[in-house]
């Protein structure tokens, strides 16, 4: 998306806004599938948590993907977007049996990650088969908050508890037809993926009727020129060798599943904001924008780096700025970053904002969530309106005091 197009979007819809390029999502999916060509027909379950706008989900569904959902609400939105229940895998963590029952009623595939929840599930649904999520004891990922496959993580069934499930299956107390592993986000080390895959392949021999192996997601995309990222072709070749050897030995038809989220949508999205003031501080020069971590929390929460470009004045000499928001605490997006000279009213573009941007936004400070816009067939499409005051008050009740 060129700067002229981005500026046109802010002229039409105002700012701040999230803007998504649907063709980029499509091209990322094609690249992803091509990386695993040695395996054949892989199953792609898009991770809805990355970006769950219903129009984006509909587009991804039309590309032939299934859906990875982590909440009953993601399931419901997915169904409204057009996914069939059988195309959705539900992978909750620590939810109540009531929510799981609701998911079963909707007809989606259940993937559970604790002995406790599996035992309760088997009492209620003894004839239903499930996936199980394993904790492979792998510590990797771009941030401690997103590393979810290590021994101290709340996610997944520890390896030393797997035999409990083997005995449950032998006693016909549970039916297991899929094994799932997901170690984290922003993993560039291919060996971590291979270790997770080998762990699951070896576990499959303990069970009688495995039909699916789900290797999750977590593929790292580059955030700036020269940044590390997952070498997808290299990973695909290595996974292909391991999987084809495993399938030959297992001697049953097994389908491989992946759950890309960020890989598909991160680079397809930008976040556009306007500069309210350029403030001279005691030591720093601040670019104060009309947004905060209520809209885009990744830099504050994950300490993530996002390129920031002044698209109103891209060829100007670069100066150092700390880009900050309007929230009542230190919501710093970038500190002493070299950016083309910034003036009041300029539009700043945050790159790689398609994943975990809007989906992690909030109404902190009673601020409105921003609009979402996509580009489809060379046209802008508004896919979410910015909030208004009534949106903040809709579910509140004023009582007599």
What residue spans do the PLM features occupy?
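A charged N-terminal "starter" segment
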Residues: 1-109, 115-128, 152, 167, ...
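Charged (often Lys/Glu-rich) extended helix/loop segments that serve as interaction or gating elements
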Residues: 3, 253-401
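General structural feature for long, well-ordered alpha-helical segments within catalytic domains
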Residues: 5, 21-24, 28, 32, ...
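Conserved, mostly hydrophobic/aromatic
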Residues: 25, 49, 71, 103, ...
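Active-site-proximal loop/turn and secondary-structure-junction residues that shape catalytic pockets
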Residues: 48-52, 73-74, 94-96, 114-116, ...
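Structured core elements
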Residues: 66, 89, 111, 131-133, ...
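Glycine-rich, aromatic-flanked loop segments that form ligand/cofactor-binding clefts
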Residues: 127-139
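Active-site loop/helix belt of alpha/beta enzymes
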Residues: 136-277, 339
């Amino acid at each position: 998306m060129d700067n002229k197009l981005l500026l046109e979007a802010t002229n039409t819809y105002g700012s701040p806004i999230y803007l998504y390029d649907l063709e980029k999502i499509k091209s990322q999916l094609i690249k992803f599938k091509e990386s695993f060509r040695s395996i054949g027909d892989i199953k792609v379950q898009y991770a809805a948590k990355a970006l769950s706008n219903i129009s984006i989900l509909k587009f991804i569904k039309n590309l032939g993907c299934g859906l990875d959902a982590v909440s009953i609400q993601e399931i419901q939105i997915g169904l409204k977007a057009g996914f069939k229940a059988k195309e959705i895998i539900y992978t909750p963590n620590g939810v109540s049996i009531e929510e799981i029952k609701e998911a079963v009623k909707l007809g989606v595939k259940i993937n559970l990650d604790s002995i406790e929840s599996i035992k309760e599930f088997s009492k209620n649904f003894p004839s239903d088969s499930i996936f199980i999520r394993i904790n492979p004891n792998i510590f990797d990922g771009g941030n401690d908050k997103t590393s979810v496959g290590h021994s101290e993580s709340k996610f997944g069934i520890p390896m030393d508890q797997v035999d409990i499930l083997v005995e449950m299956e032998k006693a016909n107390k549970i039916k297991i037809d899929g094994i799932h592993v997901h170690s984290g986000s922003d993993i560039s080390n291919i060996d971590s993926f291979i270790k997770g895959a080998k762990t699951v392949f070896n576990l499959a021999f303990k069970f009688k009727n495995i039909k699916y192996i789900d290797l999750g997601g977590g593929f790292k995309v580059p955030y700036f020129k020269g940044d590390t990222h997952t070498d997808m072709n290299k990973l695909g070749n290595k996974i292909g060798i391991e999987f084809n050897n495993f399938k030959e030995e297992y001697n049953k038809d097994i389908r491989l599943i992946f759950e890309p989220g960020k890989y598909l949508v991160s680079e397809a999205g930008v976040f556009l904001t306007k500069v309210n003031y350029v403030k001279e501080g005691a030591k720093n020069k601040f670019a104060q924008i009309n947004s905060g971590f209520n809209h885009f929390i990744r830099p504050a929460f994950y300490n993530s780096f996002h390129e920031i470009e002044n698209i109103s004045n891209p060829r100007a000499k670069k100066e150092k700025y700390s880009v900050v928001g309007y929230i009542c605490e230190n919501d710093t997006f970038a500190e002493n970053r070299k950016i083309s000279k910034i003036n009041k009213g300029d539009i700043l573009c945050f790159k790689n904002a398609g994943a975990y941007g809007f989906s992690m936004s909030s109404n902190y400070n009673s601020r409105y969530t921003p609009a979402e816009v996509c580009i489809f067939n060379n046209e802008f499409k508004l896919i979410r309106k910015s909030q208004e005051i009534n949106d903040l008050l809709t579910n509140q009740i004023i009582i007599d005091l």
